A protein has these predicted regions:
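Active-site/substrate-binding loop(s) of hydrolase catalytic cores
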Residues: 187-205, 210-357, 373, 380-387
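His/Asp/Glu-rich mid-to-C-terminal helical/loop segments that flank catalytic regions of hydrolases
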Residues: 389-411
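Short, hydrophobic/aromatic beta-strand segments
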Residues: 108-112, 159, 230
């Protein structure tokens, strides 16, 4: 039976808080002012291979997170890096990630070619795929509208990426470490499968008994290149445990449900934005045409019905050009009125010199922040981190914003 098109939910009202629960497993569709077609569209898969040139310089995309659609020798010291999107139209987030080496030590100029799209991400390098360093700004230039960068190559492999690689392997390692450190409070499992059969993980943070607790929902990595948003989510979750006394009190009344990597297919394939269905997942929160949004909305709905939770807040972690909070025009009619202003104001108090930028918008598009309000009357916020925001500040801000959220919700 296709629950997506059937609306036979029974609304159950709790006596103590007037909270509505949907007595069904699958999330119903929603109507928004702007209709967006999210039925699957064809995509182009890159060919996974090792590229060899006549000059002894080679490159490969044979690893998760890679994007290298072609590698062309212009001459013995200049090479073209081609990255094309999975399909179009698409947001201009040209992702690249590859390994490169040379048979002799040499300086090589790499020309980044994205077709009609402009360069966005400042290159990072690594010798092991785990520890990253941004290149010196003196190494990078622009010639005839194309970005070029100079690298010293040897027989040893150099990884060159748009942003630090954070794939499913890194995610599992972090979840295992978090669970080991907080085994009574952290649980994780598999909510379902992606279009290609990869695991969609969930994390359940709180005491084992989740019934009748207020619920916070966290999302990340709907868009594969948005690694800084993933870092902010990690820091936010780490911040939930920074103060043991606050955490103990908070988790007696709240649980936190996390979907830390919503688009693992896109992450593994080095996509610019979309899933394997060729769709921006953050436009599929109306009819759930894509398996990732369908699995996660069904999981949330089943969890909240089973445990009789009141969803109070949804935060979706993303990356963009600079830090910003995308909010709804007002949260006065939400289940936690005026939370947004309290939270934003409190964030400033612990981050010297930081002025949060807030961009409110109406409930027009089928995006996650709107879905939280439409379905649960919960506050929905898109928590955006800049591409180049310093990583230590991402960590500091993530932990601080978690602490202030906990304090406000405990009032």
């Amino acid at each position: 039976m296709n629950y997506k098109y059937l609306l036979f939910a029974t609304l159950i009202l709790t006596s103590c808080r007037g909270v509505q629960y949907l007595a069904r497993q699958a999330a119903p569709g929603a109507t928004y002012a702007e209709t967006i077609d999210t039925k699957s569209k064809p995509i182009t898969f890159q060919t996974k291979k090792i590229y060899h040139t006549p000059f002894g310089v080679s490159a490969t995309n044979q690893f998760d997170g890679a994007r290298l659609c072609d590698f062309i020798a212009i001459n013995d010291s200049t090479y073209r890096i081609v990255s094309t999107p999975e399909n179009e139209p698409i947001n201009p987030s040209p992702w690249y990630a590859f390994k490169i080496w040379s048979n002799i030590p040499r300086e090589a100029t790499l020309v980044f070619d994205y077709g009609d799209f402009a360069h966005r991400y400042f290159p990072k390098t690594s010798s092991d795929g785990h520890h990253w360093m941004a290149i010196d700004s003196a190494q990078i230039d622009s010639i005839d509208g194309k970005t070029t960068a100079r690298f010293f190559l040897t027989k040893d492999t150099t990884w060159i990426v748009a942003q630090e690689l954070y794939t499913e392997a890194e995610l599992r390692s972090w979840m295992n470490a978090l669970q080991a450190a907080h085994h009574q409070t952290v649980d994780y499992g598999i909510a379902g499968k992606t279009k290609l059969g990869r695991d969609l993980y969930y994390m359940d943070l709180g005491e084992k008994k989740a019934k009748h607790k207020d619920l916070i929902i966290l999302l990340s990595r709907q868009h594969p290149p948005e690694v800084t948003g993933q870092f902010a989510l990690k820091a936010f979750i780490d911040g939930l445990f920074d103060s043991p006394a606050l955490a103990e009190a908070f988790f007696k009344r709240h649980n936190v449900l996390v979907f830390p990597m919503m688009n693992p297919d896109g992450v593994a394939l080095g996509h610019w934005r979309h899933n394997v269905g060729g769709i921006d997942l953050n436009r599929d929160w109306a009819v759930y045409n894509q398996p990732e949004t369908r699995v996660i909305t069904d999981f949330i709905n089943h969890y909240t019905y089973k445990n009789r939770n009141r969803v109070v807040l949804g935060l979706d972690f993303h990356s963009t050009w600079s830090d910003v909070y995308y909010t709804n025009l007002s949260d006065s009619a939400s289940v936690i009125p005026n939370f947004t202003k309290q939270w934003i104001d409190s964030i400033k108090s612990g981050l010297e010199g930081y002025q949060p930028r807030v961009a409110p918008s109406a409930l027009r598009q089928p995006v996650s922040k709107n879905w939280f309000y439409v379905h649960f009357k919960a506050v929905g916020i898109t928590y955006e981190i800049g591409d180049d925001t310093p990583r230590d500040f991402i960590d500091k801000k993530g932990r601080w914003t978690a602490k202030k959220m906990m304090e406000i919700l405990m009032e």
